[in-house]
Amino acid sequence: MIKRVIFDMDNTLMPWKTEYFSEIYTALKELNIGFTEEDFLKIKKAFSEYENNYYTFNTKLMIDFINKYTKKNYPEELIEKLMNKWSKCAPEKLPESTIKVLEYTKSKYEVVVLTDWYKEQQVKRLEKAKILKYFQEVYAAENTKRKPFKEAFMQAIGENKPEECIVIGVDFQRDIEGSLKAGLQAIYYNPNNTEQSKKISFYNLKNNEETKQIKYYTISELKEIMNIL
């Protein structure tokens, strides 16, 4: 029996737009740091590479990595300024269909967010989008390993058993494979591929020499969650 619904945040509940990275330009200018287009692109790429090299989010580690990757010496204040700017990057209103899903799930289950980012910034974005009230807790990647590692999901289940929790997310490797391997249930939100919508699929989980098939759902619209839960 499902007791807790765990939502991924970016591109599941609200969009993360490519243009948000333009805040790097603004932050550099406000800090009076000279830069070229190549510098901007390297910093942008460094954020992605950081996630491939580190499993938690730490400001000191992040700026050290960016400086090593870009061969520059940016101040830690750059990260702090970017976090402040990105915390405002959220729509002020979400689609009514998303609100209905949140109201529905909150009326039946414990509802939380599991994000691969800093908690403070994500809470502010949820507040701006006016949906923070739907969540019992926001779990982030500052004090434990991020998705797809088991530790991320174990913190998000709270006092529940893994099988009593279901993860909803758009990243198959991080959200779906990660949660299934940790023993949770999953709904794969795949808005770009309607052919897979409403299908029940099976993930082959290999444990030593045994292979176990685990059921998960695929949807193309968030409102389909109400037909599953």
Question: What do the PLM-derived regions correspond to, one by one?
Answer:
Residues 31-45, 70-82, 133-134:
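Short, surface-exposed acidic
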Residues 20-28, 44-47, 82-86, 122, ...:
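Hydrophobic alpha-helical core bundles mediating ligand binding, dimerization, or RNAP-core interactions
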Residues 60, 84-112, 150:
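Short, acidic loop-to-helix structural element flanking the phosphoryl-transfer center
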Residues 18-22, 96, 100, 124, ...:
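Generic recognition of short, well-ordered alpha-helical segments
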Residues 48-84, 96:
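A metal-dependent, Asp-based hydrolase signature
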Residues 1-42:
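Active-site neighborhood of HAD-like aspartate-dependent phosphohydrolases
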Residues 1-3, 103, 112, 117-229:
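Asp-based, Mg2+/Mn2+-dependent phosphohydrolase catalytic module
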Residues 21-25, 59-63, 119:
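An amphipathic alpha-helix signature
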